[in-house]
Amino acid sequence: IIVTDGAFSMDGTIAQLDKICELAEHYDALVMTDECHASGFIGKTGRGVPEYCGVIGRVDIITGTLGKALGGASGGFTSGHKEIIELLRQRSRPYLFSNTLAPSIVGASIEVFNMLSETTVLRDKLEQNTKYFRESMTTAGFDIKPGVHPIVPIMLYEAPLAQKFAERLLDKGI
């Protein structure tokens, strides 16, 4: 099994899932991707890095959170082939000994998925805002790591300087 994040949380790097799938096919391996930092806003319809890289049918297990972009307070999901999910339900100790999600979180999460299926307006707006922010920060002279992800690393290269920036942002209510 090859396991990767779809998008990496520290810098927004998007995994080359198409190449990972090719590697998995060469070695007859499964592919699992954690979409916690991609579900809802990466890919044309927000289905994450598998959609973004054009490999939806080639990823065997997808995990994600109902928090972050999807707005839930807790919980997550694992999706995959029926046989894999049945095995995980039987053998995953954390699953066996955990509590179920509150019905309100499940209901709200279902509505978010429905909303994302019906329109890309919010996702498109986030993409536009991210592009604007990246361009504006670059124009202002900041070193921005290239990418399309809404996680936008601003490279300051010195911890004391980063602390000063953080303090100033807090002072301004940001």
Q: What annotation goes with each model-predicted range?
A:
Residues 1-33:
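Active-site phosphate-binding strand-loop segment of PLP-dependent enzymes
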Residues 45, 51-87:
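Active-site PLP attachment segment
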Residues 2-4, 31-35, 63-64, 97, ...:
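General beta-strand structural signal in soluble alpha/beta enzymes
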Residues 70-137, 142-145:
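PLP-dependent aminotransferase class I/II
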Residues 15, 124-133, 138-172:
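Conserved PLP-binding catalytic core of the aspartate aminotransferase-like
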Residues 6-11, 38-41, 95-96, 154:
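Short, small-residue-enriched loops and turns at beta-alpha junctions
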Residues 96, 171-174:
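A common structural junction motif
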